[in-house]
Amino acid sequence: MTERIPLFEEDKDYIDEDHISEFAKALVWQDDYDYDANTTATTDITTTPINDEVPGIVSSLPSTNGNNKNKNKDINGTVSDSSSITDEDIMNSSYFDKPHSSTNLKSNSTKNDDDDDDDDDDLISRPQSGTTDNTSTTSLSSKRPDLITSKSDWFPIGGSRSSSSSKKGSSNYHKKTTPTSSTSTKSTIEILKNEFRNSSTYTLLRWPILIFVFSWIGILGIFYFMIRIYVAVSEYLFTWRGERKRLRNKLRNSKTYEEWINNALELDKFLKLDKWSENPKFSYYDYKTIKLTILKLQKLRHQGKLIELMVILQGCLKKNFAGIENRQLYSHRYYGTKNLVEEYYQEVVKCLELINQDNNNGDDNDDDDNDNEKIDIEKKWKFFKIVSKNYGKSALCLSGGACFAYTHFGIAKALLDQNLLPQIISGTSGGGLIAALLCTRTNEELKKLLVPQLARKITACEDPWYIWIPRFLKTGARFDAIDWARKSNFFTHGSTTFEEAFQRTGRKLNISTIPADPHSPVILCNDITSPHCIIWSTLLASSAVPGILNPVVLMMKNPINGKVIPFSLGSKWRDGSLRTDIPIEALNTYYNVNFTIVSQVNPHISLFFFAPKGTVGRPVTSSTRKTRSKQQYASFRGGFIATALEQLLRLEIKKWLQIIKSLDLLPHFLQQDWSNIWLQNFTGTITIWPKNKLSDFWYILSDPTEFRMKEIIEKGEKCMFPRLLFIKHRASIENVIEKGKKLTLTKYKQLKSGGVDCDEDVDVDVDIDDEEEEGESGGVVSDYDAQSFQKVVGWSNEDKKLLDELDNEDEEEDEEEEEVDVDDDDDDDDDSLSDSFEITTEHLKQRRNTIF
């Protein structure tokens, strides 16, 4: 028997029962929640507390009089513990049948100063003789606070809150109500009707059209998967045979990234894909501009002309400069890109490091063994701030996908091992759990946690069928929100807020949630939109898929006194993947993100991933005959006809889904527009599509074992290996820019403070002298200064002559390679068909450098 390997922090759960109790209270008694009890004790209006309605919740609440140190007793005198409260219990209608009491949540200061108010509260909570039910009801409803409630919060299948309260044994308040109070007791307003559905023709034709559309989509889907099967079979039978199949299997079985690189280079060499990197010409990027930029940067760097060097860098440090970040540059080899692209990234990093050198902080450095220009520290800081804004930032986006989301652990581990984990991470539904773990732990802690033993902490689906089936029948959801709140505390490091997570790790967490109202906008919870919101509550909301988990209330820490209260006045929220699985636009708005690494594991989306022109690190490989006949580096997957049919059928299916959404034909089951789940943008700059086996669907709602977790992590790592080179190139420039921005800002602050040393932990996002920045650029020439920019960056006659010489050299190399190809064709019997056609040298040269 193998020895049990301990997990880092395995004995810690970070559960705060006080916070869980506040969450349970806000979840059920949304209308009766006493905000004043958690903030101040000086209010003159008291609301109906729920101490006697749910035994045990108040036992964990903070109190000023100290009476809550002991466990609270219910009406029958039985001691109850807050840990026993579950979502199933609190949704039971029996809790609404007990009388209200308002004696336990009142502080001493309120009792001493407002005795008359206490007497009124006693009359409200305990109707005495001579007091009618209507009087009690009117008094109570007038004192309850006005809260914002969601329009479409769903309730247990047995009925809504109002229906359960009308049963025998309900309180007097629920039995007889005036029209005004009846409206206020509901946590949801009357469902709004769509005016466009009132048309008689809509009513008559809606279902026939919907049946026709779904039938046509089904037929298209059958043809679509026939095309996919044809492509897969043809690749298996005709493309991957013999030695190339052995090398590909060797590549797939690589255990480490270094081993994967060696195997990928071996496969590239066998397929002669390494020769593609030697030719700089390619139709998907402007190689002439890249060449000229490299020559100018090298010349200015050797001459030490830093001012002009900064001008050139301002022009080229921007998103996808000259097509340098086009995915096709990394989709023609298993490992590698154009040699010219490699040279560009290396040269830009050298130039940025030269500017970032500490040789110009105001004093002359006699020890410097170069003649570089001296640049004022303020100009350098402004330069790094400008290029940081132009270049943008990278972000890791983790999709939802139930238990398929555990593949994100392997994706994150591969990035972490190469020190490439971005500082901005977003997650939705299951991906939010992994994103929360990444943003609440340091790199050292993550290396100890991203191991197979982490499966011991994943117990969300541990309830057997004889527990969750009755729960589903009672509440309409398989899982219990309060139970999940406790289990998620380990991954969120307790009741950590978004702001606290950023302060602890420096990473910015983003979790996408949507209001239960189908028409309200999506909110991306982060340190900007909701800095004091508790992360585990947003995880529950982001996982609230209908039938899986009911909508929940977000919780936040009061920044004044640290008390836990509902966020957004008690509105309920649900799964963000229903509308925004990958919030690319919001990330760009908040953090200037323009390079996204998307890990997409949604099974209903990954089925339609095809990549007809190949993807990063996974080129489309031609058959053996075509590879030997001519150096064809680009081809459509399965051939042009198969690719055209696949694109046609997929876009046709998407068109009909868009028609269903535009005409609002689909029924809004549980008040949710389900047509959005196929019509979102599910991809990013780099998209990882882990392959799922058919057997994986059996575990879609089950907890992984340590053995399965090991397989899942390894699968995620292997999916990430082909993309790491592209990410490494992007991160090499981004990291140098951020380093220069941070160091120059520190020195700039020291200069502003008269040479006094500043703390090491400097907020690099703090703007200094905004008015000055908006004015003169401090000596850094702007891209929009036409004369200066043309003088420094413009193409002179010498540059054009140099480019012509380079083109002539490339043409000579192409002609030599083409002669070799023709000789090889004459010696190959399999190429007799191609020899029957006359192919001119000019045609070969043009064909060589295009994807088509």
Curated annotation (Swiss-Prot):
Region described as Disordered: 41-184, 800-840
Motif (GXSXG): 427-431
Annotated localization: Membrane
Compositional bias per record (Low complexity), positions renumbered to this chain: 41-52, 101-110, 129-142, 158-171
Occurrences of domain PNPLA (ranges): 396-588
Membrane topology: Single-pass membrane protein
GO molecular function: triacylglycerol lipase activity
UniProt keywords, alphabetically: Hydrolase, Lipid degradation, Lipid metabolism, Membrane, Transmembrane, Transmembrane helix
InterPro entries named in the record: Acyl_Trfase/lysoPLipase, NTE, PNPLA_dom, Triacylglycerol_lipase_N
Catalytic residues (positions): 429 (nucleophile), 575 (proton acceptor)
One of the GO biological process terms: triglyceride metabolic process
Its biological purpose: Probable lipid hydrolase.
UniProt family annotation: Belongs to the PLPL family.
Protein name, entry field: Patatin-like phospholipase domain-containing protein CaO19.1504
